[in-house]
Amino acid sequence: MTLVNQVRHRFDSRAANYDNPLTAFIGERELRAIRKLVPPHTEVLDYGCGTGRTTLDHLRRGCKVTAYDISRKMLAIAEAKAAEMGFEAGFTTDPGLLEGRTWPIVTCIGVLDYYPDPAPVLKTLRTYLEPSGLLVVTFPNALSPLAWMYIAGSRFTVPAVARTPGFVRRSAARAGFRIASLSYAFPGIPPLGHTLVAGLHVQTS
């Protein structure tokens, strides 16, 4: 089974029980950092939207959102939440519908955790970004004991990988990006935060 299929299977099997008080608590702390990078009332691609936490936050802030995920079951939950709240967004599991389109903001939250080499995914995300746009990505922070608890638990499904800030910078550079900002979440104190939140711009020279 390919890594993508492993990740899809993991989230299809967990979709019904994915949302819980712990993930909501951590997710809200991550959103506080993400909101600082994503202006309200802009167009956003939320790549790997899951059950919609980030997508719904964008929608609440007046953004026009395209939401993509490889898990049909996770995406269905996100779409149902949006409909219940009276929001409209473009939900899809078909990457072909993203081809040839670009956005000023692309968010990719909690996706790169599972890729031993994130550079190929970052290169794909670069094709969806306007030349002056911003890509917002997250990684488990290898300097945080909280992140290592998460890493330990993930080994029973699809193992996640923790990253140092230096690794994030190198991977971004390999994919043609430069770091515009790097912050921490849960807590928002460097270097203890569980999550690294990186804002990336395309390298121009």
Regions found by a protein language model. Give the residues of each.
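Conserved class I S-adenosyl-L-methionine
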Residues: M1-P39, H41-G50, L143
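Class I SAM-dependent methyltransferase SAM/SAH-binding core
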Residues: T51-G96
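A short glycine-rich, Lys/Arg-flanked "PGG" loop and its adjoining helix->strand segment in the class I
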Residues: A119-P131
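Short alpha-helix
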Residues: A160-A175
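A conserved beta-strand element that flanks and buttresses the S-adenosyl-L-methionine
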Residues: T107
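Short, glycine-/aromatic-enriched active-site segment of Class I SAM-dependent methyltransferases
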Residues: N141-P159
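Acidic carboxylate diad motif detector
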Residues: V137-F139
